[in-house]
Amino acid sequence: MAEPMTEQQKTENWLEIGTIVAAQGIQGEVRVLSASDFPARFLTKGQRWIRKTPQETPQPLTLKKGKQIPGKNLYILRFTEITDRNQAEALVNYQLLVPATDRLPLEPGEFHVTDLLGLIVYDHDNGDRLGIVTDFYSAGNDLLGITLDKNPDKEVLVPFVEAIVPTVELAEQRLEIKTIPGLLD
């Protein structure tokens, strides 16, 4: 008999690819806000998983059909198991997941968002520790949310571009930024 998953395994074995934000129509479709840079995760038929909280064991669903809402980071998905609006509404705020083993390969200089969270941030010029990466925002330009050691109640947003973030060393859990005037204010 298989051992039950530990809390850590429940979280580490999965990648959150989106959040169900609304029901769509009357046939059980849902709207999903993407947390992935890979549209195929929402357009390709196959197995996906959902859970309400990271402490829950993910439940499987079969993606039957998916399409992107033009100009938005939203997808409309239809799952075989969800057949009416009431079932779809019950899934609002659930996380949509794939196994961590399904990570797609990246080009050099590309990173999975989950790998950036928790990295220790250092000043590129003098090596001083500045804080920790606590969030990631996809906007016009990607932004790192950094909680500073000197002011842990404040998050600063730093553009995630090579000119400002020249060094990312995942194995060392290290990220370096070039501090320019006003960047960390």
Curated annotation (Swiss-Prot):
Protein localization: Cytoplasm
Biological process, per Gene Ontology: maturation of SSU-rRNA
UniProt-listed Pfam families: PRC, RimM
InterPro entries the UniProt entry points to: PRC-brl_dom (IPR027275), PRC_barrel-like_sf (IPR011033), RimM (IPR011961), RimM_N (IPR002676), RimM_N_sf (IPR036976), Transl_B-barrel_sf (IPR009000)
Entry annotated with the keyword Cytoplasm: yes
Coiled coil: none
Keyword annotations of the record: Chaperone, Cytoplasm, Ribosome biogenesis, rRNA processing
Main location: cytoplasm
Gene3D superfamilies listed in its UniProt record: PRC-barrel domain, RimM
GO CC, alphabetical: cytosol; ribosome
Domain comment, as recorded: The PRC barrel domain binds ribosomal protein uS19.
PANTHER family, per the entry: RIBOSOME MATURATION FACTOR RIMM
Annotated function: An accessory protein needed during the final step in the assembly of 30S ribosomal subunit, possibly for assembly of the head region. Essential for efficient processing of 16S rRNA. May be needed both before and after RbfA during the maturation of 16S rRNA. It has affinity for free ribosomal 30S subunits but not for 70S ribosomes.
Name of this protein: Ribosome maturation factor RimM
Species of provenance: Synechocystis sp. (strain ATCC 27184 / PCC 6803 / Kazusa)
Originating gene: rimM
